[in-house]
Amino acid sequence: MDIKKISGVLRAIGGSQRDKSYTSAIIAAAGLSRRFGGEVTKQMTELCGVPLLVHTLKAYEQADCIHEIVIVTREDEIPFWEKLCADHGISKVSRIVKGGETRQESVLNGLEATSPESRFVAIGDGARCLITPEQITEVCHAAYKYHAATAAHRATDTVKLANKRGFIESTTDRDTVWLAGTPQVFKTSLYRAAAYTALDKGIQATDDNALVEALGHRVRLVECGAQNIKITTKEDIAVAEGVLAHRAKMRAEAIADGNEV
């Protein structure tokens, strides 16, 4: 039995499987944080002593399904994030590029900076710092099967549709209502077609799912819980710090009990 030959075959199989699912994370962090306020952008705001965006990046760094990370940020912040990634051991970052005038343009800039190997793109909000590596992986695996999948959470409150004057028009069946979050993961070729079709037609959407939907493609919903919030106001910081503190406590207790986490 030729061990070297068998090892070579196994490596080739592993490489082939990786090529089919090579996933590039595009982290959108170029916003001006107008609703957040303050002198620094929310991505730079410290959360448990660490800039908010670092928490987000660590989740994608630790997700086995993610092969590279492209950060899209403000041009003047690029050196800052280069240093932070080095300081915090975030090694999957391949490029840090400047954003565009809109979120769609920023994500498109990130798309063009991904590796030629990229087969899937996982588009994430830099401000969703409570996403976990396990949730990222679950959404990615759904996308590998359906070519499009998104983190989401079922609505638990009664949902009302209102008119422009602030009066209820109708009540929606909440069993069919989901709140979309990120990551939103797509086959790279599919998302590229969706993004450039939207650009050509002047379509502006509030999330990347809508661009893919506009092509007539279905997007699989993956329940990721209510904690996957997007930090929007300073009040959200307190909520996020509470969640992170609780997770740290649970991790410490598990380690003390001899359970690896």
Residue positions per predicted region:
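SAM-dependent methyltransferases
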Residues: M1-I26, A30, Q62, D207-N209, ...
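N-terminal glycine-rich phosphate-binding loop and ensuing alpha1 helix
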Residues: V9, I13-I78
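Residue-level signal for inorganic ion chemistry
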Residues: I27, L53, G110, D125, ...
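Short aromatic/basic micro-patch
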Residues: E46, L130, V185, K230-I231
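Acidic helix N-cap motif at the loop->helix transition within catalytic regions
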Residues: P79-L84
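Conserved donor nucleotide-binding strand/loop of the catalytic core
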Residues: H88-E101
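Active-site nucleotide-sugar/metal-binding loop of Leloir-type enzymes
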Residues: E105-F120
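Conserved core of the sugar-phosphate nucleotidyltransferase
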Residues: L130-V222, N259-V261
